[in-house]
């Protein structure tokens, strides 16, 4: 019974998505009992790359397809071969490819999405059989991926028309011509940059088409394993989110003290009515979507097991709950703020709120439509929801406002940042995978610099008050994060005793609060928290891992302590071991004992080094714990 109810709900929203795609320019026919598109794993489909791989795929899928699949195909064999060639390269995952069933011509998004339901399976058992053999993830994963991709296609067609690349090229050509006509050579040269096309490639998914599906999957797996081994304490580094969120809310006309007061209650579960409002706003559901890692800049197509392990990891380390709670609170505050402001005309709104709304093309007429909408009350608080706005276009603008402002407050990456971080390279190529390994964990910092700090510098001139608040608040919360991480390591808070050590402490807190937490320890002369050096950290965690392997090999040749290096490497690369609460117990119960066994006197020297470099002691000394 529950499965049937779930299928009806999914069918309802798939049908709504189909209608939105058609309204945007596609021509997708209605298919009875349609629930979701089939997922396809390029690596499984490609097999060994031989002609026999196509034969195996064709022989498996053909008896499971409904004959209606080939109703307009004069040559079913050729149709399947065309589909196979697209599936094995991953082209089917993008919004620009135009040939799923053998069509040709310029890339046309409307035509592309209209071909998405080419493979029609005979029944549910046939769908599941194919998914188990050549698909990726469970049916729920496929449903969410289908809705996400459909929403992306709708957004692209609404903004860029049915041929996004041609539309973008046309805009750029017209702007360059205008710049040349007014002899503005600098602007004309800037418009010749490849960056706009690189951003579009991220938006439409073509940047993720792997040059080699095997290489792309290997790189994605390595990066996922680095997350599982390195980010166990990331929630302790997330306290500066409070300041970044408050700064965003300030630019929406919400006083700072009110923002902080509401944020302090963010982790307290909300009532069912308020949770329904948050869901209607589309905020605080990252855990449900398996998308918590997105705020760290990850954008990987992971295999089912690795994906499930990653989602579990972020639940266990607390980041999933923290992210959902913070986004839910921010979204509710924005919606409540607009409801409270509904009695005012647009010119009477706070100037910062006006400026922010204008970024989403919300001005006098749109604001009048929004404030005329019926408000929804939950647990005694009124909210303005997009679904209540009568004009569909204005409702979409309001929804975009809520979603983007919440993402800005949580320092989530944008398409521009992802394009910048990938340097325009393609996934699954040697250069592309190298860049992605080097840039792992750095997109968060780039986003903070460009979105949060950039907002205070560039929007309507320098906002001195906003800049001062952001720096001071993130520094204070950065220090609190450092202190919590020290306590989790068994150490007392750092105690500077002169001007130089105070300066180092403030600088490290600024770095921690500004999104560079993994580099903060180096200002205290320490290696990073997993034992790698500064160069290894700058070059990405995988470079640090290679550095660790090199040290182990050198030690095995008699140039060091092989047992100690093996312990350090193993601890730093075992998934889930670095969960901050588990790591504390493991350190004192097992790891410190192993390190002392492998390198007698190691713990005493570590305590002395921490005292010498940081003037810091332990509230639970490792040397006492191993006696």
Where are these regions (language model features)?
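Hydrophobic, often aromatic-rich secondary-structure segments at membrane interfaces
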Residues: 112-236, 240-507
